[in-house]
Amino acid sequence: MKSLLRLSCLLIALTLLVSMTACGTSDKASNDVSQSSGEQQAASSAEVTPNATPAEKVSLKIFTQQMKENAEKDSRTKAFYDSIDKYTAANPNVTITVDALATEPYNDRAKTLAAANELPEIFEVLGSWNRDFVKSDLVMDLTELINSDSEWKKVIRPTAVNNYTVDGKIYGICLEEGGSTTLLFYNSAILKECGFDQPPKTMTELKDYVKVLKAKGYTPISLGNKGDWVAESCYLSAIGSRYTGNDWNWNIVNRTGAKFTDSEFVKGLSLMQELANLGAFNKDLNSIDYQQQRVPYYNKKAAMFIEGYWAINSLLTDCPADVLAATHVAGIPDCDESKVPNYAAGGNGGWAYALSSKLDGAAKDAAVGWLKTLISKESANTVLEGGNPCAIEPGEYDQSKMAPLQVEFFDLMKAVPFCETYDLIFEPNVIDVMCNGLQDLLINNVTPEKLAEKIQAEYEKTSK
């Protein structure tokens, strides 16, 4: 990955997965809208002042996963479109066009655009893409822009930029915080019917739960891994780290001795396969996606499903009232043999907004001005009041607007130690082999040891 050519080959070939964050988006193919009006921008000492209004007419395009039809149910999306309305109302000579795609088609087009060096002025970038984009000079260095505006810098938490910092320079800013990609959503009524008063606390307990739930005719855990990222992002990132420790993850990134063939990492793969062989999951796990995995849960056919915090928005919107009333959230069960903390994967932001390195003049001023409008206390308040975690320092916000399940989630997050989500830090080609291999692992087409060897072989092909 030393050149754009190598990036091109990788990006076209790979299907990258997501953690965080646009995972509640619609599967609609695209959503092109032009934003040029909205509420007038309010002047407040609590807000960051955007760059000076460009004197000439400027047109910007934002490529994003924020589907406008989701604004009513997803506060991240609402904050995004509110920021466009606010900025264009205050800057009528600036027109912002939004090109929005759902997560998986977004990945595909972003890879193609990056390979052709045709990314628009503003776009979203995944943590694992960042180093390649920097090497290929696709993204603007934002460090000086941040450091030169002390008020703006104050609202940007470390979790907003951790995965987008290369050699001390910042190339992207997340609006949302990672929360957790590894949450256990469970129907307490079904568990009670089967004799359980609480969710499984350990993997040993989970194995017992699986046997009882199956005997009662329930799918223990609904899993949709068609897109191939759920098993990695929502399961293995935490399970693997509970055996290896989080320092191992960074040793992989920095190439300081860790290997995917290490016995502790193989233990995580082995546990995944053991759960599948016990019948913890539905047989069609590789034929349905992350949204479809919720349907058996909504229909009381499945007792549990494991996903990230983004699923809460869909639960609140799509889940039948009686099922929602019985739904609670917990961390995935502890790994009994773990000698390190029982991590939840997440914490840092998964997707960041980045600016094209090609921007200059009035277009650059406008893009920076909009970014400052989005990355603000006002946006943070909107995101938090809608029950989503935020990487930006908020002002005073109304916690009473949160649903009980959202409050339960935030309370849970106060007590868990975080590890990195693999797809946010490991190289894209390594993640691709890992994710494809997990599909095979869960249907017994490969052993844990062989999969570990395949991942390691791909890892060794790449340079630091």
Feature roles, as predicted:
Residues 58, 64, 89-90, 194, ...:
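Extracytoplasmic/periplasmic substrate-recognition and gating elements
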Residues 4-26:
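Sec-dependent N-terminal signal peptides of Gram-positive bacterial secreted proteins and lipoproteins
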Residues 48, 54, 102, 127-183, ...:
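Hinge/lid segment of periplasmic solute-binding proteins
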Residues 210-212, 254-285:
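Glycine-centered hinge/linker elements that transmit conformational signals in sensory
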